[in-house]
């Protein structure tokens, strides 16, 4: 099975916090689910933890792509982000979308994260969807002590919402 590609500074186990959620779904493909992540303007419709998504330099509702800069609020944090990896899935290749997100601040308040998603077609008509986030900073260390379980539940809800929309073939515009 495939794994998230980690820049060295975000290698899990060496950061202040790490969260991982995963699901396997029969009857869908990576190609069918992936657009529900790349169309970030609809996240709030299937995941209560995300809101106020704004893609830099666009008045329309474009898709996330390599190099896209955007901002959003996730579970109360105003995050600035840039897509650092983007690979559309195909029958023989997993889809990948990762961004570096940060909350500006000083050494006590700055928060950096690498959030990666992987969409992998599996045997027997299944898709594996993995999301992982590796976090750096004092706020991340505090989250690890007090709220890691809530992050896990939130990320699982994000995956479940994506799958639900893909099953229902919800329009993306």
Regions flagged by a language model, labelled:
Residues 6, 18-20, 66-68, 114-116:
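Short structured motifs
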Residues 32-37, 43, 70, 83, ...:
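Hydrophobic pocket/interface hotspot
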Residues 73-126, 134-136:
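Hydrophobic-ligand binding "helix-grip"
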Residues 128-130, 134-173:
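A conserved amphipathic terminal alpha-helix motif
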Residues 21, 41-82, 86-92:
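Short beta-edge strand/loop motif at the mouth of beta-sheet-based domains
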Residues 4-6, 63-66, 96-104:
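Short Pro/Gly-enriched beta-strand edge/turn motifs at strand-loop
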Residues 1-61:
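Hydrophobic ligand-binding cavity/cleft-lining segments
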């Amino acid at each position: 099975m495939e794994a998230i590609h980690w820049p060295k500074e975000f290698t899990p186990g060496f950061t202040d916090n790490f969260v991982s959620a995963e699901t396997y779904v029969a009857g869908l493909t990576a190609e069918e689910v992936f657009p529900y992540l790349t169309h970030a303007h609809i996240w709030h419709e299937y995941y209560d933890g995300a809101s106020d998504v704004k893609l830099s330099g666009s008045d329309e509702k474009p898709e996330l792509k390599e190099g896209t800069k955007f901002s959003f609020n996730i579970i109360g944090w105003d995050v600035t982000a840039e897509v650092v990896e983007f690979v559309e899935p195909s029958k023989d290749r997993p889809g990948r979308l990762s961004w570096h997100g940060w909350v500006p601040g000083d050494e006590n308040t700055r928060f950096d994260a690498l959030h990666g998603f992987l969409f992998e077609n599996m045997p027997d008509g299944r898709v594996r969807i993995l999301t992982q986030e590796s976090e750096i900073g004092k706020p991340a260390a505090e989250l690890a002590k007090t709220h890691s379980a809530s992050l896990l539940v939130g990320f699982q809800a994000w995956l479940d919402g994506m799958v639900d929309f893909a099953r229902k073939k919800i329009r993306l515009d």
